[in-house]
Amino acid sequence: MAERIAASLLPAASPSPAPSPPPPRPRVSAAAAASFPCCSTSAGGLRLRSRPSRFPQKAATTRSGRAGAGARAVVRCMAAAAVAASDAAQLKSAREDIREILKTTYCHPIMVRLGWHDSGTYDKNIEEWPQRGGADGSLRFDAELSHGANAGLINALKLIQPIKDKYPGITYADLFQLASATAIEEAGGPKIPMKYGRVDVTAAEQCPPEGRLPDAGPRVPADHLREVFYRMGLDDKEIVALSGAHTLGRSRPDRSGWGKPETKYTKDGPGEPGGQSWTVEWLKFDNSYFKDIKEQRDQDLLVLPTDAALFEDPSFKVYAEKYAEDQEAFFKDYAEAHAKLSDLGAKFDPPEGFSLDDEPAVEEKDPEPAPAPAAAPPPPPVEEKKEAEPTPVPVTVGAAVASSPADDNNGAAPQPEPFVAAKYSYGKKELSDSMKQKIRAEYEGFGGSPDKPLQSNYFLNIMLLIGGLAFLTSLLGS
């Protein structure tokens, strides 16, 4: 292909149609023969120059020789232009910077959410990029950050922007997904088989429309989850596995309208105090999310309608029960689902993407301590004191097993009760300051005030009284 391009660029390479002998050729320097625009630079076209030859017989090359030199120059130009969307070396350096941020700010949950919300707008029914949404870096624009589902993500962008400024050779789309996967791994989760090379959108007009991300409290939670995730091309197993990432993080009523302002697990941090978490150790990635939803023993732990649906819906429940019992199975399925989610809608350059997994595996970062020398004698045995059995915690909501005596079941053993969701935390008791101001403004717009109730509508009261009297008269008359 490069030779054909060179031939089209150099008309001298085509044979002359004239049958008569050509006139004597003027001597052309090598610089003139090889000087043409190549790879784009800030200073204009890059020109390949060499010093004029001291030997005329070598400087005056044949037409085929000049064509070959031009073709080789085009090949060199094309090879230099074939650069991936992101630089692999800069991505690796950015990953180290992300790890340092995670250690100091405990921002694992919001980094996971950043990557998810950039890719979760994908619509498999739309082929064109970027109209189809997905992992394209559009979340950096205010037009998309202002979507209701993205409340609070401006804080994640503030943390990640200095890294983007430091490494301009990587795209936002890659950086968001790199931060998300790194946060999972640093929190103790599985290694995500990621690939990179995502291309960024360039304008706010390319942002997807609002309403493609899942809602926490839909009217029919299971149907809503399927509607949103099926649109992305994900199945029931992937829905449940990805939901398990709620083992990290908290819900804040001033952002989502859900959860308590604080609990015994969040009032002292780490990070910014407050909010309600799904799990006790909400910065540790494990399968506690599924265990805690199933047991429902602690009212300080959050259960959204979409969380409860995982144990209420028959198809979801198969996977939720499995993950509650088998953390290894959860890690495996989650890693695959996360990698798939991070690729949704992305346009890769190169088309196949590239991996950063050419360095030691994660397990090798923290090597196990060396075993004690064989010659060292074992310590004397210590008599263990038998601890008292822990007092069982009563199940107050959503008990998995009925507590009624066998006599109430005609002598049969107690039967499991259907899963009952915990009391949903609608967050209506604690409104954010902005919401309070909005409600107050609307209230005052109708003529009311905090110190003065709305005046009665006397005309409406009279009409209601007349209507009531007319109704009574009709009854008495009949």
From Swiss-Prot:
Extent of Pro residues compositional bias: 14-26, 369-381
Single GO term (MF): L-ascorbate peroxidase activity
Transit peptide residue numbers: 1-76
Binding, heme b: 246
Protein EC: 1.11.1.11
Designated gene of the protein: APX8
Described purpose of this protein according to its UniProt entry: Involved in defense response and tolerance to the bacterial pathogen Xanthomonas oryzae pv. oryzae (Xoo). Plays an important role in hydrogen peroxide removal during infection by Xoo. Involved in response to abiotic stress. Plays a role in hydrogen peroxide removal durings salt stress.
Reaction catalysis annotation: L-ascorbate + H2O2 = L-dehydroascorbate + 2 H2O
Protein name, UniProt field: Probable L-ascorbate peroxidase 8, chloroplastic
Site (Transition state stabilizer): 113
Disordered: annotated span: 1-31, 44-66, 245-276, 346-417
Cofactor: heme b
Annotated positions binding K(+): 247, 279, 286
Gene3D superfamilies referenced in this protein's UniProt entry, alphabetically: 1.10.520.10, Peroxidase, domain 2
Active site: 117
Topology within the bilayer: Single-pass membrane protein
This protein's GO CC annotations: chloroplast thylakoid membrane
Transmembrane segments: 458-478
Enzyme class, UniProt record, top EC level: oxidoreductase
Localization in the cell: Plastid, Chloroplast thylakoid membrane
Assembly and interaction partners: Interacts with SWEET11/OS8N3.
